[in-house]
Amino acid sequence: MWTGQNIAYDYDAAHNSADLSIISLEAILNNGMKTTCGGFANFYSALCHSQGIYCLYLKGGSSSEGYSRAQLAEAPANHTWNAVALDGQWYYVDCTWISDLGVENGIVSGGENIKPFYALFGFGEMSIEHRIDRSEHICYGG
């Protein structure tokens, strides 16, 4: 939940097609701890890797843009989040959705409404609002 409490969602970057210059670890740390969902998932993957936790970077559709559960199957890939393996079980983590902390037009807002539900949730819960299209294991350093 640290990421959701300390990294802000960059609405300006999201409106302007965020790329690697926004979601890389260096960009997050050097640009005022703000990013888009890709950066949240990238940062969380790095944290897990540093602790020896197997973590996947997931990309797919989500209900974040107003898609209903029925529409989710056909929705474009519009979101990234993570899956972690803990004690032989898979759990899902959506750091973007954990907090409402955001930056738009240089103004920081939110941060009061932490949603721990998105910290370690199961496949059934995940599949209500997320659709996995692709998964990657990203390795950081040696």
Where are these regions (language model features)?
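Secondary-structure boundary elements
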Residues: 1-32, 45
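Short linear motifs in intrinsically disordered/low-complexity regions
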Residues: 11, 17, 95, 106, ...
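Residue-level signal for alpha-helical context at structural boundaries
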Residues: 17, 21, 66, 100, ...
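Extracytoplasmic/periplasmic, Sec-exported soluble proteins
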Residues: 29-40, 74
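Hydrophobic/aromatic-rich core segments of domains that either
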Residues: 42-126
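Ligand-recognition surfaces built from glycine- and aromatic
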Residues: 123-137
